[in-house]
């Protein structure tokens, strides 16, 4: 079997590289996964605890809102107590950006539509330079500048891109180049078109996302369509899935999108059938239980859980460990695509967990290689 499948290749857009704290964004760096806290930032302990849950889910960068002086006052403690770079989200009050930079924020997110005059932007740029922060120019369809709304009549991709490039020029005119850009909209068509246009006319790293995407289910679908299209086209250097849900849920969905496209790998990827009358065991309950039992594993590994022999053996060919439902209460286990042994239904969960943990131990010790790594296009890592 070929170790590289050309139909899985994604040619990523070439962008310049910046840093958000210790995390590289753009260039050949992995596409980073972001989220945003929804606690009161002034409640440092609650915010720290929420960030730590996001860290366990695999977050790379976390954004916190800084609407008032109490929030920026708490930022120093938050930055000190967590293990990921913090982006300070600034709207309306440019002084909050300066305070956040002093407090140790790794990046300042500013919205050109409401941060104020060019002079205020200049002060923010100087603070970012003085304290080693990068900047995110965060353009949003819901808060475009008045002159662009008058020019275009309504928010559209062209207005989003024009706003972004205007403010990129301001930063460049101040000889500041450590910035990334986002052009978000809640409308998938508008957001995707804006990002595609922006990607074609500049080499700045892009933070991609569909803003205000909705609830956990609806927002996951909406973000998967929008971000999936962009990532498949090679557009995007860092991403956030915006959900009306806990931040760690955003992180998990973000990772699942990247894993689905082979752009990054982390933890156990379970491939499972929807189940039908042919199933030899309860696939739905088994998968739900395994997702919970295996969430502590960070090493990339694939596991197929298929209820019958129609597709089970074929799926097992492409996974590290495969399970196919059989008759008489016994099910076939595959290892590295080959039939290995059968197991009784009663011991199924514990047996699979044991097999996965043993495989992970062997991978980490360098004794074997995961099929995920074999199938992966090196250019997409």
Swiss-Prot record:
Q: Which Pfam families match?
A: GcpE
Catalytic activity, reaction form: (2E)-4-hydroxy-3-methylbut-2-enyl diphosphate + oxidized [flavodoxin] + H2O + 2 H(+) = 2-C-methyl-D-erythritol 2,4-cyclic diphosphate + reduced [flavodoxin]
Required cofactor(s): [4Fe-4S] cluster
Superkingdom of this protein's organism: Bacteria
Give the record's cofactor note, including how many are bound: Binds 1 [4Fe-4S] cluster.
Q: Where is the signal peptide?
A: none
Which InterPro entries does the entry link to? Answer: Dihydropteroate_synth-like_sf, IspG_bac, IspG_bac-typ, NO2/SO3_Rdtase_4Fe4S_sf
Please name the pathway.
Isoprenoid biosynthesis; isopentenyl diphosphate biosynthesis via DXP pathway; isopentenyl diphosphate from 1-deoxy-D-xylulose 5-phosphate: step 5/6
- Give the enzyme class: oxidoreductase
Chain residues that bind [4Fe-4S] cluster: 273, 276, 308, 315
- Keyword DNA repair among UniProt keywords: no
Q: Which UniProt keywords apply?
A: 4Fe-4S, Iron, Iron-sulfur, Isoprene biosynthesis, Metal-binding, Oxidoreductase
Q: What is its EC number?
A: 1.17.7.3
Q: Set out the biological process GO terms recorded for this chain's protein.
A: isopentenyl diphosphate biosynthetic process, methylerythritol 4-phosphate pathway; terpenoid biosynthetic process
Which GO MF terms are attached to this record?
A: 4 iron, 4 sulfur cluster binding; 4-hydroxy-3-methylbut-2-en-1-yl diphosphate synthase activity (ferredoxin); 4-hydroxy-3-methylbut-2-enyl-diphosphate synthase activity (flavodoxin); iron ion binding
The record's family statement is: Belongs to the IspG family.
Role played: Converts 2C-methyl-D-erythritol 2,4-cyclodiphosphate (ME-2,4cPP) into 1-hydroxy-2-methyl-2-(E)-butenyl 4-diphosphate.
Protein name (Swiss-Prot/TrEMBL): 4-hydroxy-3-methylbut-2-en-1-yl diphosphate synthase (flavodoxin)
* Taxonomic source organism: Gluconobacter oxydans (strain 621H) (Gluconobacter suboxydans)
